[in-house]
Amino acid sequence: MPDYEKQKRNAAVEAASYVKTGMVIGIGTGTTARYLIEELGRRVSEENLKIKGVCTSKKSEELARAAGIEISENPEQIIDLTIDGADQVNLHGTLIKGGGGALLREKIVAYNSKEMYVIVDSRKIDDENFGSFPLPVEVVPFLHRMTLENLRKICPSTDLRKNSDGTLFITDNGNYIADMKFGRIRETNELEKKIKSIPGVVDVGLFNNIADKIFEGNDDGCNIYVVSEKGRIEKEKGQFK
């Protein structure tokens, strides 16, 4: 059976090898990003790597500080490179993100970066079933029931995310997450615009035209894909199939 944790680690370690001293690095959130933080922390300790990290969640910031990474909460310069995971990736390089509830900060950091690298295991690139992972939408608490009903006009199977104890999940920004269960998504640009046009919606976990490279870990190493000018992901040497 595939070792998905090993795959995540392989993707994270390969992407981390692109980080150089002096860079400001956007640090993602989630299980794969944890391996990134571990590797960056190792390089800080063993290789004297000097970087500043901009974290996309309080949890990632906590892990990064513990790993010895210097944190910059509001950098004056543009972020050189953001490395983050994804819940799903299609063949156009569009991402579904927000499974960990940090989609707003993740999008802000990625948007303000020179480049964004995505680290995933071998399950995550799935064009045919893109949208089978629920699409997270961050909404403000004020009149959230009305916002939820407006989202249900687009996708009837939409519910507010809850914690294991039944309480509503609250983001680091004090907002709620609505998960939209489409099953399949095709017109990602139009869908993003439609959802964001609803008052009460802060942002949506569709990342269009943001990713530059995809690092897909496998049991033996890592495949690297670039998002071409044609809007397709391609192997750095040869077409993705």
From Swiss-Prot:
EC number(s) per entry:
5.3.1.6
Active site per the UniProt annotation: E106
Task: Give the binding site residues for substrate.
Answer: T29, G30, T31, T32, D84, G85, A86, D87, K97, G98, G99, G100, K124
Quick one: a GO cellular component term?
cytosol
User: Is this entry keyworded Acyltransferase?
Assistant: no
Keyword flag Cytoplasm: no
The enzyme's first-digit EC class, named in words, is isomerase
Determine the domain of life of the protein's source.
Archaea
Write down the chemical reaction(s) this protein catalyses.
aldehydo-D-ribose 5-phosphate = D-ribulose 5-phosphate
According to UniProt, this protein's pathway is: Carbohydrate degradation; pentose phosphate pathway; D-ribose 5-phosphate from D-ribulose 5-phosphate (non-oxidative stage): step 1/1
Q: Which UniProt keywords apply?
A: Isomerase
Write down a Pfam family by its short name: Rib_5-P_isom_A
Under the GO molecular function aspect, what terms does this record hold?
ribose-5-phosphate isomerase activity
**InterPro entries referenced in this protein's UniProt entry, alphabetically:** NagB/RpiA_transferase-like, Ribose5P_isomerase_typA_subgr, Ribose5P_isomerase_type_A
Q: Which CDD domains does the protein's record reference?
A: RPI_A (cd01398)
Which Gene Ontology biological process is one annotated for this entry? pentose-phosphate shunt, non-oxidative branch
How does the annotation summarize its subunit structure?
Answer: Homodimer.
Say which family it is in.
Answer: Belongs to the ribose 5-phosphate isomerase family.
Q: Which HAMAP family match?
A: Rib_5P_isom_A
Question: What is the stated purpose of this protein?
Answer: Catalyzes the reversible conversion of ribose-5-phosphate to ribulose 5-phosphate.
**Protein name per its UniProtKB record:** Ribose-5-phosphate isomerase A
